[in-house]
């Protein structure tokens, strides 16, 4: 829909909403209060929020929809934290705890690289008594075997844990990770950047203050990060827009975020949902809420973060296609392995092949392109091709549910003597 059509429709909606959307189209910064109004939109106003977000997406990045060929390597599910939303982690005494040795991590990275991956994403639980050099050793081992692969590794929670285990500052530890081969950090462990909220859903998790310190320090060292938000649980829409505004302020200061990813809460196996720990906890966000959240993200971040990624693992293929008209422009990664959403009850698999992504993008009239982690365009496609990963059965990569049952990588509890 062209801008003239949007202008015409804006005359027929609530004046407050119309004013906010007009400001967005004028590329003015949208306040927290104004962004909250977008969540109240109904009827034609609801659709106009999506139209405006789509127009801003078109101006910012055009009709190219990107994806990255990558592999997730969640090398252990053993964790000293017990977050209410996490069905992935296991206590070190549980039988389902696993821990991949460095040689297996490297094997998985090499397998992915040989199938065309440009990135490995490395995240895991926080095992007790962790060797302080573990993260560095893993990165060095990967880079020794595959010097050209991009390591997108270690959330702010893991960085803080590594710094504590090493008894050094966050800055010193990040410098060590960079020297060891870390190229970028996932901006996960953010959930909602409100301390009272975090104390409810994940007591003991990294604080807002420490999360910000890790992110800003990484940016100051030339380490880009992503940014994320987990929504659809007990937070309010005001909590969401304040979270996005906080990320916007960080981006103004550092310019280090490459993307923003709204992450819908997967409830089925999440402890705080299964045991009804919090009054009013929701079963994730519904379809309209998901669409609005991606649109609000684009509108609030328009002048600051170019790339809005949807999570096909959480939303599925059809909803992901729809979100490409609600402000999103990135399909994320091929993944090959996915443990965290799957363990919580997601049903959309762990591998989306490059030719599948390209087809999904073409079906909605946009142009697929493979990108690097930092959003450099590697290949644009006007006709399909056949990549190595397109010919692989996803069973080749194993699964989380197999991993927690086999003995080969079972976590060995150091406290058993």
Residue ranges with predicted function:
Residues 48-92, 97-123, 185:
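N-terminal pre-triad scaffold of radical SAM enzymes
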Residues 169-173, 234-248, 315-326:
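Catalytic cores of alpha/beta
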Residues 27, 53, 83, 122, ...:
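Conserved, mostly hydrophobic/aromatic
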Residues 36, 71-72, 93, 123-133, ...:
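Glycine-rich, proline-tolerant flexible connector loops at the mouths of alpha/beta enzymes
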Residues 1-44, 107, 113, 251-417:
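Auxiliary Fe-S-binding modules of radical SAM enzymes
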Residues 109, 136-140, 174-175, 212-215, ...:
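Generic structural signal for well-ordered alpha-helices
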Residues 117-215, 220-227, 233, 307:
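Conserved SAM/AdoMet-binding glycine-rich loop
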